[in-house]
Amino acid sequence: MLKEQLIAEAQKIDASVALDSIFESVNISPEAKETFGTVFEATVKQHAVKLAESHIAKIAEKAEEEVEKNKEEAEEKAEKKIAEQASKFIDHLAKEWLAENKLAVDKGIKAELFESMLGGLKELFVEHNVVVPEESVDVVAEMEEELQEHKEESPRLFEELNMRDAYINYVQREVALSESTKDLTESQKEKVSALVEGMDYSDAFSSKLSAIVEMVKKSNKDESTITESINTPDTEAAGLNFVTEAVEDKAAQGAEDIVSVYAKVASRF
């Protein structure tokens, strides 16, 4: 809208007044004066349009750069905020779950201890022919039943706790991967993801991930250098439409270097 308006204004420039003052003291025919005035006015309008388009292009370019900059800053802040909120939320869930199931977990541990003690008492009674009164048998049966219930509940609780720990590790792993690869290209991110696939989150994950990211960056630089070398033909051989053997040897050597880079990364783990 602004571009069309400026161009339209430039095309409406009236140069006839300035020409009248120029030709005031010159003896020239009206036809020549009109022809010259037409050419002069067309030239002025043409340059005015080009100047307007140039200014509009610069303004648009600056606006796009500002928008892109603001967009990147907003995305970075959003990612950081999401990661912090996710970490806090997961920590809260873990603490809440442990608080809610503390009694059940404690009972499970106590049940195992009680089972061991009860088994030892039974063996002791049998060895020494100790007779247990009938009224005590009911108490023992009730305790065994309660013990069985706790034994059945304990595996479920521990399985749920392990699942929550695994989910926490998964989120922390994804956050670390996202933060480490945010400055990489999409192809570089895919390479890093492929190399860390199967690696579980641990204390050493961050250092291993950093090493892989650096190796991927270096390998991409090597690939760019090799591509430039291959695409640059030999000056003397250009007329014969072929690439020299030296370039082919360099390309082969570069490919071997890239393979060695990934081999070094794999050997670290």
UniProtKB/Swiss-Prot annotation:
Gene Ontology terms: cellular component: virion component
Keyword terms of this UniProt record: Viral capsid assembly, Viral release from host cell, Virion
Superkingdom of origin: Viruses
Keyword GTP-binding among record annotations: no
UniProt record similarity statement: Belongs to the T4likevirus capsid assembly scaffolding protein family.
Protein name per the record: Capsid assembly scaffolding protein
